[in-house]
Amino acid sequence: VEYCAAGSNNGTLERISNVTFANINKNSTATTGYEDFTATVGNVTPGQSYNFSASHTGTTYSSDQVIVWIDYNKDGDFEDAGEQVLITGKKMSPWTGSIAIPVTAPAGQTTMRVRLHDSSTLFSPNATPCGNSGYGQVEDYTLNIGELAVSDVKKNNISIYPNPATDVINVSNVSSKTKFEIYSVGGQLVNQGT
């Protein structure tokens, strides 16, 4: 799926240094008007809410604002009802909020777009998912809704089943000194051991 171009005309001031959402904790150099971080995948579950934070370590202004969109129906745009999922207050860094994933969100991978822009009418604001703003930055991420983005373990004939599981999993073909970690669909560590 190809999305509309977005960015800023001036990437030297208001920029994004970090985005934290679900299991995403992505630092960036914040040097361009657009960064493609779709190789970074966040795992979310329908019906759950997740804290969101974007920040910049440099200069920010009281008119700066972050807006987030998720292409829930995977149609290549962020224009459908409910796809603008967060609009922060106008303030200096950090910009925070909570994003609720609808129970009806289809499972699978889609794109999340994050825009930081200066909302002042003096600096060509752009509160839409497409096009450029005068100042700011846009970053795209991949979200995996409803299932972990992890392929079946094949190395050394290790077998984990059933997948998905609700309360019991079986692991076979491992030595008694094997370390393990189990993560929820939301990316939280729920169990670990040897």
Label every PLM stretch briefly.
Residues V1-E147:
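A broad "non-catalytic interaction surface" signal
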Residues A149-T194:
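C-terminal outer-membrane/trafficking sorting elements
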